[in-house]
Amino acid sequence: MASARAASRGVYRYLCPNCGGPNSEERLSRGLPCPRCLPRLPRKGVSGWTGLARLLRREGTLGAGVKAMASLEEEARSLWRFFEKAVGSPPWGAQRTWAKRLARGDSFSIIAPTGVGKTTFGAAASLFYACKKGMRSYIVLPTTTLAANVARKLESMVESTGCGRVRLLVIHSKLKTSERREAMERFEKGDFDILVTTAAFARKYADRLSGYRFRLVFVDDVDAVLRSARSVDAILKIVGFDEEAIEKGLEVLRLQREQARLVGLLQSQREEVREEARKKLLEVKRRLERLEAEIEARRGRTASLIVSSATGRPRGARVRLFRVLLNFEAGGRGDIGLRRVIDSYTHPTDGVAEKVVELVRRLGTGGLVYVPIDMGVEYAERLAEELRRAGVKAEAYHAKKPLELLDRFAEGEIDVLVGVANYYGTLVRGLDLPARVRYAVFAGVPRHKFGSDIGDPHPSRLLRLLSILAESRIEEVASAARSHMGRLRRMLRVLSPAALQMIAERVARGEVEGGYDRQVLEAYQFLREALARDDVWESLRELDVGIVREGGRTYILVPDPATYLQASGRTSRLYAGGITLGLSVVVVDNEPVMRGLMKRVSWMAEVDWRRFEDLDLQSILREIDEDREKVRRVVKGLYRGVELVRTALLVVESPNKARTIARFFGQPSVRLLPGGGRVYEVATGDKILMIMASGGHVFDLVVRVDGRDLEAAGGEPEHAIFGVLRYRLGGNGAAAYTPVYTSIKRCLDCGYQFVDEASRCPRCGSELIRNSLSTVEDLRRVAWEADEVYVGTDPDTEGEKIGWDVALALRPYAPDIKRLEFHEVTKKAILEALSNPRSFDDNLVDAQVVRRVEDRWIGFTLSPLLWCDFWPRYCKRVLEEYGEKRPHMDRERCAKYKAYYNLSAGRVQTPTLGWVVDRTLAYRKKVWLYRVVHDSQLLFAVRSDDPEVPESVKRVLDNWVKHHKKTGIEPWLDVKAVVEKEEWTALPPPPPYTTDTMLRDANRLLGLGSAEAMRIAQDLFEWGLITYHRTDSTRVSDRGMQVAREWLETRFGGLAGQLYRPRRWGEGGAHEAIRPVRPIDVERLQLLVEEGVIELPGTLTRRHLRLYDLIFRRFMASQMREADALRVVYRLRVPELDGYTLTLERVVEIGRPGDAEGVTRGFTLVWPYVRPQPRLVEGREAWIRARVEGRQVPKAYPYTEGEIVEEMKTRGIGRPSTYAKIVETLFRRRYVIEVSREEGRGAGFVVATSRGINVYNYLTEELRSADEEEYGGRIAGILRRVPSLVSEDRTRELERQMDMVEKGDASRDDVLESVFNEISDLALLLNIEHPIKHRSRAEGNTQGNTWVSNFVACAVKSPEVSRVWGAGVG
């Protein structure tokens, strides 16, 4: 419900794309410059950057920003037009993106599916630079055949474009002797414009090639380039870096490691360590800046390098030189993270081989058959022979076979290839034939085979066996296995395959040369010793592994899910426009191993296993063949005019989330941007996705509005209040508000965040500042490259506003921007969100604007009162009451500071502080508590202040306790207990967590503070382990129910059907309860991380695991059946207490007698926090002896952090996103502290400090009776209204109004006007606010007031206020 207004709804500094000045929200949303650059809005849309440049040139205001973009756009469009002429069709989205990067002179790694035209683009771009720019290019290919093919393609392009003068030189091994001699002569003379060779030639002649200056080097065999340090140096030299530049790059790598170490030391507890780290960090930063500037200057004179994606994971310092010198890291295959496979299994009635033959004959050509690795090449050969005898054209393929077999298979001359299911084998990893491979058959479950002697001590092999022993019920074995796993996993992350193989060979020979060797040897010896124990073998039989006897020896068969996913993935490949459908069939030869495979695969991917016999095979094969036909048409270029692949930028908030999403789709390529940002690039089929992080908020309200801001806002504002302009609308009293935003700066030294336009930290003076403007520039850079932009910030009002700010910043560079909403970070959720983007929700944005502006206004209005009026009063009280000797937390501060600026007040903060104060004061008051105890069990308790208990009862108890103190004789009572009712009842499970209940239990059960719990939950969400954690919904989605069912089936087997009770809990809305996203419990999660199956972008600590376990158990409990509980109701009568009678209810049993399987225990099987109590008496009634205990106790106990959050939810103030922040602020301001419980167990109590009590009393009581003589009559009258500003009722009402804005039932300007009316008099009279049109009103009301003069003189010394206060607008 936007108000009609003459001015902008918002102003953003630095976002004019032309001059870099402030720009309005409305102009940004249209992609236009600020009013100074473009005074008159164009009637029609502006066509691109070149059209905008022409428009600004006519105005005489063309600036550097638009001029540079127009030049880049024209360069890219020239390449697009040339490409269309050369190829016969316009470039697709990916090719347009690559052209834009080339126009900028960037180097990058290509991640793209089959059929997108990588090589075609490389050839066309090379010809463009040769023909139109007179610049050389070099194309490097993996094979002679491809080199010859590209040469033919270039010759055709030359003819199409009329570039007959371009000199093309092709050198490969199939040239005749005379042709090669002539080619080499031309090469030596430099008689070429485009050079095409293999990678081997590039390595051999790198020094000679470095003498030619290339504009483009296109490498279609990056694996060959990354194979060795020599290969890396060769390509860097060819691109244009000499030995000196390479050495500088290596020095940068060393300094970056040192910088990371020093940043870690800034967190030290010792000041001298931090100070030394600061000095060294500045020195390292300066050296890095110098070296990076020198490299940047050199980079401007080098070729653009384009490389294809890598199949492996390259490691080593030389590989990292690409990042330093060329700003990118080569990614892996962009399609291994995606699969579209029908996963099935079948049990053979005869033999495995016979079943394989039957399947292949039914499924036809285009098949891959995999035999288990323990069966070996010999079995693959025998199986291929059996297939041939059955009339199938089959061949076994392995390392000793010629590569031409793969070519014959690709051409259709061979129907089926048979190979070994080896993770590193060609048929498992290196085959990418989307038009040819239709299905895969596994002749036995993929597995590893281990004997008791272990065999080869390769670390990866040992890790697999350790992962099985880690599941052993023998705790000492499982614990030791997990310990060895952690060490080996760290080793596998940092060492190359060659280094790992060398370690294995040394250990096998009994040679130990270093720490890594020793770790492998220790793991090897542990495994041998463990497998020599009979009890270990017995425990293994309980797991989903195979135990077989062969030749008098026992072996373990361990399922190999990674190989299964890789091998079956050969049937489902990315191509330009989608992912091919594939079929996988496992012929089961060992049932336990198959169960283990199915279970382990589900931890790595979303797989729906089906019986092969239940498949609609005809329909599946028809779809498989239709997909292959699409691929063939794409490769032949028959989809001209149809854009099958587009590029998209996805912006999320955190780098962790960006990395997590990228890894769903394989090993991403990474580009480093000038502002320090990273962009991860992956392929999803119809999109090439570039993923970046905004780092959270990129803009916040300015502290002081200036003239340029007013110019951008337009209209005639009446006031500027703490970064917000107020406009009067007509004569009806309505108003409109324009927030003014600027970039956020963060000190890398002390962590302080500020918005001042300063190059030094206002708090500590450090020059180590990170400005969010650099993030904006990086985002704009990538947004210009993309066809479309998606903003995937968090799914709440704060995330909507962050996303809206980002969208406005990017709009001039990206016309197509949409919002993505996802509540869990999983591959499925991301793909669904990409398929269903939405527009931004203006109501959510407006609601967050209201929250931020209201928070700023209240804080900036009230906080100065605390700094400059409250503090001296408080200090006077402290010094008078405590003197010089009695300790007090603020005595030294009072002596040191006349004003104290680490104080604040807020609308939600103050009532919350009030609850803590009330409980703290009540805690100091004492009442008598009488406990009547039988056999250490509390029967009942009586408090002396309980109005429900008769006074006569209290008097008797009091007398007995006093008598005991005098005589030392313990008072005893006779209590008659009668069972009134005894019945079995259903005990319902708790609902899944919302934010408040999670914080309560994290505090109560784990001892975590609310801020820490939220930080841990944020990690778990961003790592893709739980759903969004800022929610007040208990709703469970269908997917959530499926997660519960799958885990219960794994955990309880056949009992799962009796235990599973799916519940929705809440209805409607997009939000969901907090739950795990996969059926993985905490023990399994820990193992999968240690195995490397799950890779997280951060360190999984014990606290992460404990909170995850709590969330996991609570959710599983919510989806389980009720517990059968035996409830007993007792009536207790105490004759000696005037016949006092009361009722006592207890749950004495959970789970019915005779239920050995525990089904009737229901949800308590996983939720251990519900326990039965002992029976009070046996039989129906009995007299029992009870002891009376009496002691003084607090009238009320203080809150715990969890209870404070629960109270905020119950009383309706605060929101899921602010609960923890409010509590954290109270601690940071030292208004509250945490104290241990008397019994020393459980979450600590939160008590108000002297400072907190006095702050609360000042705001709510003292100002209510402000003295007119001290403050002046007018000001005193206004100060008396302050208590109402921070009252709980007013806060709750404002929360209600903000909820109405969120739903679209109220206008943001109307709500802000109501807040302004509350604070305006105070702001004007104290000269805080900048009156624009009516300055005399403020001056007139405060002239001659001594209190105001002193107050302002004090307040302007605050770093926050000195740039806000003062007359007029700066």
From Swiss-Prot:
Record-annotated residues binding Zn(2+) 1?
A: 16, 19, 34, 37
Zn-finger (RG C-terminal-type) intervals are 744-772
Compartments annotated for it: namely: Cytoplasm
Where, by residue number, does Zn(2+) 2 bind?
747, 750, 761, 764
Sites where the protein binds Mg(2+)? 653, 794
Q: Which PROSITE patterns would you find in this protein's record?
A: HELICASE_ATP_BIND_1 (PS51192), TOPO_IA_2 (PS52039), TOPRIM (PS50880), ZF_RG_C (PS52037), ZF_RG_N (PS52036)
Q: Which cofactor does it need?
A: Zn(2+); Mg(2+)
Question: So what does this thing catalyse?
Answer: ATP + H2O = ADP + phosphate + H(+)
- Residue numbers binding ATP: 95, 112-119
State the signal peptide span: none
Tell me the active site.
1028 (o-(5'-phospho-dna)-tyrosine intermediate)
Annotated region (Topoisomerase I) at 643-1370
Ranges spanned by the short sequence motif DEAD box, renumbered to the chain: 220-223
- Domain Topo IA-type catalytic, chain residue ranges per copy: 841-1323
Q: What is its EC number?
A: 5.6.2.-
Q: Which SUPFAM superfamilies match?
A: P-loop containing nucleoside triphosphate hydrolases (SSF52540), Prokaryotic type I DNA topoisomerase (SSF56712)
- Limits of the Toprim domain: 647-825
Judging by the UniProt lineage, the source's domain of life is Archaea
Q: Where is the Helicase ATP-binding domain?
A: 99-287
**GO cellular component annotations of the record:** cytoplasm
Subunit structure of this chain's protein: Monomer.
- Comment field (misc): This enzyme is the only unique feature of hyperthermophilic bacteria/archaea known and seems to be essential for adaptation to life at high temperatures. It may play a role in stabilization of DNA at high temperatures.
Domain text: Introduction of positive supercoils requires the cooperation of both domains. The helicase-like domain probably does not directly unwind DNA, but more likely acts by driving ATP-dependent conformational changes within the whole enzyme. A beta hairpin in the 'latch' region of the N-terminal domain plays a regulatory role in the enzyme, repressing topoisomerase activity in the absence of ATP and preventing the enzyme from acting as an ATP-independent relaxing enzyme; it also helps to coordinate nucleotide hydrolysis by the ATPase domain with the supercoiling activity of the topoisomerase domain.
Annotated PANTHER family: REVERSE GYRASE
Name it.
Reverse gyrase 1
To which species is this protein native? Aeropyrum pernix (strain ATCC 700893 / DSM 11879 / JCM 9820 / NBRC 100138 / K1)
Q: Which gene encodes it?
A: rgy1
